[in-house]
């Protein structure tokens, strides 16, 4: 199934049913009085997080959704039936944004979590409601109210504890294959990974974490180059970033320069995301000569001026993976405990996530607008070229 992580849809709640104008008609009851019932409420539109869905493809081609209207009231004080709510299932991790006012309506991060995006219209009132001592035969009713309508954008960000970051062919997919049951495609050409892949890493029976692998970044990614820019937003929800560096690249490029480029693109895309906890993972060390391995890795750390955690692994050979996974699990558990015990830490993390969301959203909107303008300019240029090629002949 095609992976779609963005969609724009129009939702409209149902209209409330109209109130009924009716009077009691019964033998030997010449003045039965009003008996018009109220209408039913219109159905609302609700979004619900469903763990069985992992893409927004259902909303890419069907753009309009409307809930049922409420039924009108009837005589005999019969109330009309309410319109059924329309429940739209979306993947866990979906953010809902009102595009008309550019406001985030909610974030569905738990299975079964719901958010009402369009309230159904209030029911109309029958003429019974207007009966009084001075108006015993009212002919007044009230129509049902229209339901709310919105243009909303759905943005899916995968839920993972750890995100893999690096250039194409750095070995990220091989790493996720080596530490989890996920089996992404692996090959020796760039951009083998086209969509995010998730894998569950089980350290022990009841200790596990989720890791996300996104397409590799290249220089200029923050300006729209390559595939990685489309999926960098999926790293927003992660707690920890693993920067995977190929210490023995096939093109003989400098690993340090490559690592610096990735960090620069990350900072340009979102400073808050770049400030996230990040560990350095030096991959493919099995390709280095045994007597040179330690010196080469130490030189990379020195030139990067790296002071954080670093690991030397071979994802293909499985070297160093167990220690890496154990340390990640311990860090995640310790971090979760700190957030649980210290409200200030939890609040700081929440604010940081909001800042990342805002920066990522603004950057993606800017790039989308740039692409739209570029397409418009290219189309206008093509039209001008076509006009210049036209020759007009006048027949006598």
From Swiss-Prot:
<keyword id="KW-0547">Nucleotide-binding</keyword>
<feature type="binding site">
    <location>
        <position position="173"/>
    </location>
    <ligand>
        <name>Mg(2+)</name>
    </ligand>
</feature>
<feature type="compositionally biased region" description="Basic and acidic residues">
    <location>
        <begin position="347"/>
        <end position="356"/>
    </location>
</feature>
<comment type="similarity">
    <text>Belongs to the TRAFAC class OBG-HflX-like GTPase superfamily. OBG GTPase family.</text>
</comment>
<feature type="binding site">
    <location>
        <begin position="314"/>
        <end position="316"/>
    </location>
    <ligand>
        <name>GTP</name>
    </ligand>
</feature>
<keyword id="KW-0479">Metal-binding</keyword>
<feature type="binding site">
    <location>
        <begin position="213"/>
        <end position="216"/>
    </location>
    <ligand>
        <name>GTP</name>
    </ligand>
</feature>
<feature type="domain" description="Obg">
    <location>
        <begin position="1"/>
        <end position="159"/>
    </location>
</feature>
<dbReference type="GO" id="GO:0003924">
    <property type="term" value="F:GTPase activity"/>
</dbReference>
<feature type="binding site">
    <location>
        <position position="193"/>
    </location>
    <ligand>
        <name>Mg(2+)</name>
    </ligand>
</feature>
<feature type="region of interest" description="Disordered">
    <location>
        <begin position="373"/>
        <end position="396"/>
    </location>
</feature>
<dbReference type="GO" id="GO:0005525">
    <property type="term" value="F:GTP binding"/>
</dbReference>
<keyword id="KW-0342">GTP-binding</keyword>
<feature type="domain" description="OBG-type G">
    <location>
        <begin position="160"/>
        <end position="333"/>
    </location>
</feature>
<dbReference type="InterPro" id="IPR014100">
    <property type="entry name" value="GTP-bd_Obg/CgtA"/>
</dbReference>
<dbReference type="InterPro" id="IPR045086">
    <property type="entry name" value="OBG_GTPase"/>
</dbReference>
<feature type="binding site">
    <location>
        <begin position="191"/>
        <end position="195"/>
    </location>
    <ligand>
        <name>GTP</name>
    </ligand>
</feature>
<dbReference type="Pfam" id="PF01018">
    <property type="entry name" value="GTP1_OBG"/>
</dbReference>
<comment type="subunit">
    <text>Monomer.</text>
</comment>
<feature type="region of interest" description="Disordered">
    <location>
        <begin position="337"/>
        <end position="356"/>
    </location>
</feature>
<dbReference type="GO" id="GO:0000287">
    <property type="term" value="F:magnesium ion binding"/>
</dbReference>
<dbReference type="GO" id="GO:0005737">
    <property type="term" value="C:cytoplasm"/>
</dbReference>
<keyword id="KW-0963">Cytoplasm</keyword>
<protein>
    <recommendedName>
        <fullName>GTPase Obg</fullName>
        <ecNumber>3.6.5.-</ecNumber>
    </recommendedName>
</protein>
<keyword id="KW-0378">Hydrolase</keyword>
<dbReference type="InterPro" id="IPR036726">
    <property type="entry name" value="GTP1_OBG_dom_sf"/>
</dbReference>
<dbReference type="InterPro" id="IPR031167">
    <property type="entry name" value="G_OBG"/>
</dbReference>
<dbReference type="InterPro" id="IPR027417">
    <property type="entry name" value="P-loop_NTPase"/>
</dbReference>
<dbReference type="InterPro" id="IPR006073">
    <property type="entry name" value="GTP-bd"/>
</dbReference>
<dbReference type="InterPro" id="IPR006074">
    <property type="entry name" value="GTP1-OBG_CS"/>
</dbReference>
<comment type="function">
    <text>An essential GTPase which binds GTP, GDP and possibly (p)ppGpp with moderate affinity, with high nucleotide exchange rates and a fairly low GTP hydrolysis rate. Plays a role in control of the cell cycle, stress response, ribosome biogenesis and in those bacteria that undergo differentiation, in morphogenesis control.</text>
</comment>
<feature type="binding site">
    <location>
        <begin position="283"/>
        <end position="286"/>
    </location>
    <ligand>
        <name>GTP</name>
    </ligand>
</feature>
<feature type="binding site">
    <location>
        <begin position="166"/>
        <end position="173"/>
    </location>
    <ligand>
        <name>GTP</name>
    </ligand>
</feature>
<dbReference type="InterPro" id="IPR006169">
    <property type="entry name" value="GTP1_OBG_dom"/>
</dbReference>
<dbReference type="Pfam" id="PF01926">
    <property type="entry name" value="MMR_HSR1"/>
</dbReference>
<dbReference type="GO" id="GO:0042254">
    <property type="term" value="P:ribosome biogenesis"/>
</dbReference>
<feature type="compositionally biased region" description="Acidic residues">
    <location>
        <begin position="381"/>
        <end position="396"/>
    </location>
</feature>
<keyword id="KW-0460">Magnesium</keyword>
């Amino acid at each position: 199934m095609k992976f779609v992580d963005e969609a724009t849809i129009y939702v409209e709640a149902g209209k409330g049913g109209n109130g009924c104008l009716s009077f009691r008609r019964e033998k030997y009851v010449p003045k039965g009085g009003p008996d018009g019932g109220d209408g039913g409420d219109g159905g609302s539109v609700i979004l619900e997080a469903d763990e069985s869905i992992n893409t927004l493809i259902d909303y890419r081609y069907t753009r309009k959704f409307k809930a049922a209207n409420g039924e009108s009231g009837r005589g005999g004080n019969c109330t009309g039936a309410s319109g059924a709510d329309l429940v739209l299932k979306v993947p866990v991790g979906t953010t809902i944004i009102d595009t008309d006012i550019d406001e985030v309506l909610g974030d569905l991060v738990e299975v079964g979590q719901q958010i009402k995006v369009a309230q159904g219209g209030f029911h109309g009132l029958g003429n019974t409601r207007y009966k009084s001592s001075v108006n015993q035969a009212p002919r007044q009713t009230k129509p049902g109210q229209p339901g709310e309508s919105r243009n909303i954008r759905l943005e899916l960000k995968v839920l993972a504890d750890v995100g893999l970051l690096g250039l194409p062919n750095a070995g990220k997919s091989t790493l996720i294959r080596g530490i989890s049951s996920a089996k992404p495609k692996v090959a020796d050409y760039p951009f083998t990974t086209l969509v995010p892949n998730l894998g569950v890493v089980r350290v022990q029976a009841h200790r596990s974490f989720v890791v996300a692998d996104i397409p590799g970044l290249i220089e200029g990614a923050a300006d729209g180059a390559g595939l990685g820019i489309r999926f960098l937003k999926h790293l927003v929800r992660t707690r920890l970033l693993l920067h995977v560096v190929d210490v023995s690249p096939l093109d003989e490029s400098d690993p340090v320069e490559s690592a610096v480029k990735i960090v620069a693109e990350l900072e340009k895309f979102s400073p808050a995301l770049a400030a996230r906890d990040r560990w350095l993972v030096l991959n493919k060390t099995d390709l280095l000569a045994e007597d040179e391995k330690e010196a080469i890795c130490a030189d990379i750390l020195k030139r990067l001026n790296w002071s954080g955690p670093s690991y030397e692994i071979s994802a293909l050979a499985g070297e160093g993976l167990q220690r890496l996974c154990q340390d990640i699990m311990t860090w995640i558990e310790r971090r979760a405990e700190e957030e649980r015990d210290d409200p200030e830490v939890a609040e700081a993390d929440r604010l940081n996530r909001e800042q990342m969301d805002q920066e990522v959203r603004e950057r993606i909107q800017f790039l989308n607008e740039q692409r739209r303008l570029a397409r418009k300019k290219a189309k206008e240029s093509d039209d001008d070229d076509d006009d210049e090629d036209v020759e007009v002949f006048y027949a006598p």
